[in-house]
Design a protein with these regions (language model features):
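NAD(P)+-binding Rossmann beta1-loop-alpha1 motif at the extreme N-terminus of oxidoreductases
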Residues: 1-49, 67, 72, 143
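Residues in the short beta-alpha loop(s) of Rossmann-like NAD(P)-binding domains
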Residues: 18-19, 53, 123
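Rossmann-fold dinucleotide-binding core
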Residues: 80-158
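Hydrophobic residues within alpha-helices
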Residues: 2-6, 88, 133, 174
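Hydrophobic beta-strand scaffold residues
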Residues: 13, 33, 98-100, 141, ...
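Helical "substrate-binding/catalytic lid" subdomain
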Residues: 149-270, 275
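Rossmann-fold NAD(P) dinucleotide-binding segment
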Residues: 37-98
């Protein structure tokens, strides 16, 4: 849905998606859908990719870089490892092309609303070129540093988010057992020091936030499978750097177990595990 906000902003958008439903949705939003990725890239000033993992990004870049116009700017909004992001950046540079890693936060709602947070790694000159394309999709654009820094920020942010979502779930389960209504706890947390996105937007119980996935049988949102993937990247980074992350590590274990049977549910559904 990110492309939905580019056409109204005056951009001509060519795209490719191997999944017919996604391609059809993009076409409905005014995207000129191509039969393959190199065709979609041909003639483009800016090329944005979003793929499920680093190997897919590297394979895609190997396929599309030779088809790119001279001077094209590449932006990868996938969530991948810092090492993979730097490898992709170097691959683009070997073709004489500028590249940014720009993963996002905000989920499907943010993509539709054009309020995503972009965490950007790469040269400032490249970011300034990217701004007219990113801004229609963004609520915030944060330059995090050199190549790979956007991915570093993303895995750190999502490790925090996972811990928060579990803690919020624990609080609502405890409140239930103490006889405190969900609405009362929501009002207290959102008006006090515990306030965070995991409650004011992604509240894990029905009622207080009508648009939260909890009101729609935990339809994502941000799927548990994606949170589990991001926590895997975070743990890889923790281990490779020798960092201490006891809460992050425990959250990763909890989500890894939950994902085995609940991968397609919103990650706020972790409250179901806490109840049981």
């Amino acid at each position: 849905p990110m492309s939905k906000n580019l056409v109204p902003a005056g951009h001509t958008v060519q795209g490719f998606d191997p999944f017919p439903a996604a391609a059809a949705a993009a076409a409905d939003n005014g995207v000129v859908v191509s039969d393959n990725a190199p065709t979609a890239v041909a003639g483009a000033d800016v090329v944005i990719t979003m793929l499920p993992h680093g190997d897919a990004v590297k394979r895609c870049y190997a396929e599309i870089l030779p088809a790119a116009s001279q001077g094209a700017l590449f932006i990868d909004s996938s969530t991948i490892s810092v090492d993979d992001a730097r490898e992709v950046h170097a691959l683009a540079a070997s073709h004489g092309l500028a590249q940014l890693d720009a993963p996002v936060s905000g989920g499907v709602k943010g993509a539709v609303a054009g309020t995503l947070a972009f965490m950007v790694g790469g040269d400032d000159d490249a970011l300034q070129r990217a701004r007219p394309v990113l801004e229609p999709m963004a609520g915030k654009i944060i330059h995090c540093g050199a190549a790979g820094s956007g991915q570093a920020a993303k895995v750190c942010n999502n490790m925090v988010l996972a811990v928060q979502q579990i803690a919020i779930g624990e609080a609502f389960v405890l409140a239930e057992k103490l006889g405190l209504s969900a609405q009362s706890l929501f009002d207290v947390i959102t008006g006090a020091t515990g306030n965070c996105w995991a409650v004011h937007t992604n509240c894990p119980v029905p009622g207080p936030v009508p648009t939260s996935p909890a009101n729609n049988d935990f339809k994502p949102g941000f799927a548990t499978a994606l949170m589990n993937k991001d926590l895997g990247l975070a743990m890889d980074a923790v281990n490779s750097t020798g960092s201490a992350a006891p809460l992050g590590s425990h959250a990763a274990d909890i989500y890894a177990k939950f994902a085995t049977a609940n991968a397609d549910k919103d990650f706020s559904a972790i409250i179901e595990t806490l109840r049981s």
